[in-house]
């Protein structure tokens, strides 16, 4: 089944609103690079939360949920595509005659709970990475317990050209991303791999809030044990720590060049 971004999906599922269910921000794609054919698509196993919006349209931080009770209690809104975003940031660097880009796509979850007895933490940020050379995806990465793991795209089953990532419970521990298996069927209520509405770092805006104001809030908010992997204080380090072999070192100038 073809992958769809959130804005193109029929909103056929509903759920009761809760205090942490912020309506999603409007789509805000980057203007300095075209990601429409390369963004990842996601599924979410039934043993974990569905994604939420980490920041509200009015700039409020999501308060998250305490990791108690049911592992999935209070964090599986059926209409989650109305209530979540994919936070994107990228950098591109020319080396010789080639252009290399690294893209991070981060999702927020209300909690990351290990067992019904507790364990884990309020808030979770997990992300996927897409690495391109001359606009062609060469590698994809998934986050797991504070690290990023890359796989050559030739080894991955595509979803109409988009790499497929699954958010799952990692054994007896907490939750993480992983690559989808060949032929894996989506478990989320929409019945297909999806991408919550993308908001890119230098394009996202709130209701009456500028891009700079929203970025400043995301840079400042404390999500406890969870970390946004593309903030100003860590994005360049993360890019260079996890760039695939053969990719040049990204620079501060390459981050600046991603601004519109």
Model regions and ranges:
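Fungal secretory targeting signals
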Residues: 1-19
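A domain-level signal for the mature, folded cores of soluble proteins
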Residues: 17-126, 139-260
């Amino acid at each position: 089944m073809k992958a769809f971004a959130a804005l193109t999906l029929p909103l056929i599922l509903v759920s009761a609103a809760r205090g942490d269910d912020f309506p999603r921000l409007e789509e805000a794609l980057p203007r300095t690079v075209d990601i429409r054919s390369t963004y990842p698509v996601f599924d979410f196993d039934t043993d974990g939360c569905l994604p939420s919006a980490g920041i509200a349209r009015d700039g409020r931080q999501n308060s998250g949920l305490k990791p108690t009770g049911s592992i999935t209690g209070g964090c599986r809104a059926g209409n989650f595509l109305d209530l979540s975003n994919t936070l994107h940031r990228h950098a591109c660097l020319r080396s010789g005659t080639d252009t290399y880009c690294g893209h991070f796509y981060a999702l927020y979850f209300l909690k990351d709970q290990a067992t019904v007895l507790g364990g884990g933490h309020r808030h979770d940020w997990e992300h996927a990475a897409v690495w391109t050379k001359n606009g062609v995806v060469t590698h994809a990465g998934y986050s797991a317990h504070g690290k990023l793991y890359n796989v050559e795209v030739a080894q991955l089953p595509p979803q109409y050209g988009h790499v497929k990532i699954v958010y799952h419970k990692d054994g007896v521990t907490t939750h993480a991303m992983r690559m989808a298996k060949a032929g894996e069927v989506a478990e989320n209520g929409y019945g297909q791999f999806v991408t919550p509405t993308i908001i890119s770092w230098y394009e996202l805006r709130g209701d009456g809030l500028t891009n700079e104001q929203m970025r400043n809030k995301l840079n400042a908010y404390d999500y406890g044990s969870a970390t946004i992997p593309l903030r100003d204080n860590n994005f360049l380090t993360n890019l260079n720590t996890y760039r695939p072999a053969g990719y040049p070192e990204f620079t501060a100038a390459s981050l600046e060049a991603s601004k519109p």
